[in-house]
Amino acid sequence: MLIKLPRSSECKASEITPEGIYLSRRTLLGGSLAGLALGALPGGVGAAQMSRYADVQAGAAPAWFTDKLAATRWQAVTVKDEAITPFKDATHYNNFYEFGPDKGDPAANGDSLKTEPWSIVVDGEVRKPGRYALEDFVKPYQLEERIYRLRCVEAWSMVIPWLGFPLAQVLKQVEPTSSARYVRFETLKDPQHMPGQRSGFALIDWPYREGLRLDEAMHPLAILAVGMYGRELPNQNGAPLRLVVPWKYGFKSIKSIVRISLVAEQPGTTWEGLAPDEYGFYANVNPTVDHPRWSQARERRLPSGLFSPNVRETQMFNGYADEVASLYTGLDLRKNY
């Protein structure tokens, strides 16, 4: 079934933004297809998609991903009147501290990560726990293209065309017990292939961890992504499996997931543990609640530059208020930031 989320979630195929432009949180941490060939295009992709992905660098997609592309629901969810971020920006300006603190480190060091074979553990308060090879984990689900805004806590933003499937589909399949209230996610811990994990980042207790309330995780906008820009995820963008929660700040969208646990109590998360006064558990995009060191009322839409800063007003819930505000009825969003 094609998800139709009108009102605030619509966009044109020619209008997507590159994910390569992020401000650094080194202040906290440091203190302690150059043209896709026609044959490589996914099945059913027409002239609009060819033009849209003209700058995408071809990857080396695993067979399971290539097989699933033919049945992809293109533009299942879009945004309105906003440009898609250039692929090079989206893949060469990233926060992924497992590969280093600088924005270029993930692209420079990401090739060291081996994403095949890959497995995911699902455990905790579920009736059907298990360890799954990635190709088996994704097999039941049809890929959808979700064109989402991405808003970083550092006050920059982009628009990204993801390929993935609703997280809710996975959760329903593993059958949460009545005790399940939260979902906890964990990134791979592999210092041999993730140099940032063996460097001077003593402040981070690896592996990286994130969490959602169960009702947030079940919302149809929350997805597990395996691709972007019509191809598989590059390593620096969270290959081979990442979370995307578009109404929350980007650090909630955990990358390179190896474990999904359903739990009864609110899980500890990495950034909240490092600086709870700066990074809350909810991390909903909220222009009325500032970061202690900068305003969240406005954002730089990337790409931007000295003479074209491209600054705009930040929208509540990153523009998805119509869809998600009801999740937080009665919750003090200033206290629960």
Swiss-Prot record:
| Cell location | Periplasm
Q: Which Gene3D superfamilies does the entry link to?
A: Oxidoreductase, molybdopterin-binding domain
Give the EC number(s) under which this enzyme is classified. Answer: 1.8.5.-
Q: Which GO terms describe its cellular component?
A: periplasmic space
**Signal peptide coordinates:** 1-54
The answer to whether the entry has keyword Iron is: no
Q: Which reaction does it catalyse?
A: L-methionyl-[protein] + a quinone + H2O = L-methionyl-(S)-S-oxide-[protein] + a quinol; L-methionyl-[protein] + a quinone + H2O = L-methionyl-(R)-S-oxide-[protein] + a quinol
- What's the chief localization of this chain? periplasm
Q: How is the cofactor bound?
A: Binds 1 Mo-molybdopterin (Mo-MPT) cofactor per subunit.
Name of the top EC class for this enzyme: oxidoreductase
Q: Which cofactor does it need?
A: Mo-molybdopterin
* Similarity comment text for this entry: Belongs to the MsrP family.
Its quaternary structure? Heterodimer of a catalytic subunit (MsrP) and a heme-binding subunit (MsrQ).
Protein name as it appears in the record = Protein-methionine-sulfoxide reductase catalytic subunit MsrP
Q: Which species expresses this protein natively? A: Pseudomonas putida (strain ATCC 47054 / DSM 6125 / CFBP 8728 / NCIMB 11950 / KT2440)
**Highest classification ranks of the organism:** Bacteria, Pseudomonadati, Pseudomonadota, Gammaproteobacteria, Pseudomonadales
